[in-house]
Amino acid sequence: MSALAWAHPLVAEWFINKFGTPTEPQELGWPHILSGRTTLISAPTGSGKTLAAFLACIDRLVRKALAGELHDRTEVLYISPLKALGNDIQKNLEVPLGQILQMAGERGLLMPQIRTAVRTGDTLAPERRAMLKCPPHILVTTPESLYILLTAEKSRAILRDVETVIVDEIHAVADDKRGAHLALSLERLEALTYRSPVRIGLSATQKPIEEVAHFLSGNGRPEPEIVNIGHKRKLDLAVEIPATLLGPVASNEMWDEIYDRIVQLSEQHRSTLVFVNTRRLVERVAHNLAERIGEENVGAHHGSLSRRLRLEAERKLKEGKIKVLIATASLELGIDIGTVDLVIQISSPRAIAVALQRVGRSGHWRGAVPKGRLFVTTRDDLLECASLVRAVRQGDLDRLIIPDCPLDVMAQQIVATCAASNSSVSRPATLSSGNGHVARTFLSGNSSDQSPDDPGWDEDELFALVKRAYPYRNLPRELFDSIIAMLSEGIAARRGRYGAYLHHDRVNRKLRARRGARLAAITSGGAIPETALFTVVAQPEGGIVGTLDEDFAIESNAGDIVLLGNTSWRIRRVEGKSGRVLVEDAH
């Protein structure tokens, strides 16, 4: 009980009834979070680090609700690298919030409901409008949607009152351009809010963990607190080698042997999660396993499937309605799929951290030992998997490298920042940030993109904002100025210049967005490469099954059979103009 002495009696009682005692990440993380320090919690999957971050926030909201001080404003912002993970977190938040509300009612306490909402690319327009009208107390979003919220004129206002930012699975974005994009969005959020939000990061174990912590906190701020539980958790990890002689490629005989062995292992466990490295292989493995143990016992999960089919596969595994689920990295992160007894990885996962993350999807209960089997298909696989298992047993990790000053991402964010300042929502201007605590005043803006009344961004102030993002800590001023020149002067082409998104007032050293800059920033932002996809539509129902790459779809003909979601579909027609592939069940 002493570990929860800080919590409101309702919150403490709920936690004890539900979990008994705190886990190590929770017990060590709460004091830092409650002190208002930037905190990174690094612990294995299933160790309770998500609740470690949320419980302090829930406690604060419960206290405000009981005191009649809970207003219609967003105070907690949760950022997930996956839309599916965000949806899952929101569902899991509804349970404790509902139970605490019920407990309050049973004790005769008047407590308004603490609301949660999800804002991602899947959020419907009516839900977005409702969110603007009545902001949720806890908002769940993705890095890309946060960027849009910060840039769009109407949505910026709901972020003004954010007091806590939780970045989940931070290791999944820190080492690529998507992470640099998020780091700049966090600095833009910092400049927008009334007070500096407390930042909480949740991560699988990384090396060096200090680098991830600095990525979270930003440049030039007080040292972040690190709760590092380590990854030397006991694992039941082994390499499965087929009897067939290994060669440079896997033979059909070897694949049959692998399928038979997976079936054998699945019969020894209640639920089995199989990871492969490509979407195509998901369908191939699912099809072959279904032939052996029945379609009703096998599921498929990857990014080309529709959201409905992915959620259905997750639900079936969680409810024990299927024995085996085959997935790509779409299930690698902490989506709640219930109790998994065994994780199988076909071919090398190519990274130690990925192997740990995937094997860690099993054994999600106290005292359980995660169990994983690595199936090799070639000689190279054998060498990689053997080295990987040895590294895991020795406690070694891959070294995480954060990209240094990605200029394309910076250009996007500069345009978005300047466009957002031309908003009817006033912008806090940074006056000083020497000790990491930013003092602010407010500059009134205007909703017109080219209003002379808009003060714009001061060059030095914008440069300081960019430099506070950890990936840009070493950004030279000359390089920043060259990007500003490109964005204000445009790029020379045969028919003149294009791509000029900013007005640059060199006399007053101010930057303002040109007309159309906000729209360009919103529609062209992000660091995820775009791919042309055709929507697969089942006939006659009209339900969306998933997507196919444009090249594959165009080269397909009526009558061809495609596999999606462990189901064979016969193509009826490919509609090039509408980007649709009409299919029917081939069975």
What are these regions (language model features)?
Residues 1-3, 7-13, 17, 21-27, ...:
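Helicase motor core with emphasis on the C-terminal RecA-like subdomain
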Residues 446-449, 454:
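Intrinsic-disorder-associated, low-complexity terminal segments enriched in Asp/Asn/His/Tyr and depleted
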Residues 47:
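ATP-binding Walker
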Residues 414-420, 450, 585-587:
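Short, intrinsically disordered, charge-balanced linker/junction segments flanking boundaries
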Residues 424-430, 434-441, 449:
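Intrinsic, low-complexity polybasic segments
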